[in-house]
Amino acid sequence: SSVDLPCVGDWVCVQYHDAESHASIHDVVPRRSFLRRKSPGKNIDFQMIAANIDVAFIVQSCHFDFNVRRLERYLVMVNEGHIEPVLLLTKTDLVSAAELELVLASIRAADITARIVTLSNVTGEGFDQVKALMLPGKTYCLLGSSGVGTTTLINLLLGKDALETGAVSGTGEGRHTTTRRHLVTLDNGALLIDMPGMRELGILSAGEGLDDSFAE
């Protein structure tokens, strides 16, 4: 089935041909964690998104994108796949301290217990906290809607403009620039996967993921 095919983050057994640029995949090493969602549309199958992730950074903008119901769905998906969630609230420079506190209060009201880091790609707030969380040999991913600043964050972590970023609109909303999944290696040996923004986020069975996502 399509679930058994390699996805980003998989470790595979390969046999190289005459040139090391060509190889055949013989097997996929069993996954220790995974990200999957319900296939778009009415299909009841699920789509494997990524594998072998240690920490998922769930990214939402404080300014235009924040939606606690969407955040809950991301948390269920991440916890179901045995991945540790960390919430990144971006664009804090575009909201007042009172507006930011309202966002944080809505998260607490939903009994969400995941770690939260507030970020601004303009002022650099929170960047060092994210960098300190990323350990050598571990794999991380960025999950969020289009335009919340994930590509800019990756470029900051890499220390260079390795990925294209979109112009920011007058509302502070970035334009969608990630069209495929990227896996990049940071200088310290941590691996980071950038995901395209998800227009549809469906969950098939939320039992275990639901239990792990919220306080009792």
Regions found by a protein language model. Name each.
Residues 3-19, 29-55, 83-85, 92, ...:
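Helix-rich effector regions associated with P-loop NTPase G domains
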Residues 16-21, 62-64:
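Short, charged beta-turn/beta-strand-edge "cap" motif at the junction between a beta-strand
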Residues 43-116, 214-216:
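Conserved C-terminal guanine-recognition region of P-loop GTPase G domains, centered on the G4
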Residues 93-148:
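Canonical P-loop GTPase G-domain recognition
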Residues 146, 150-152, 156:
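Walker A/P-loop
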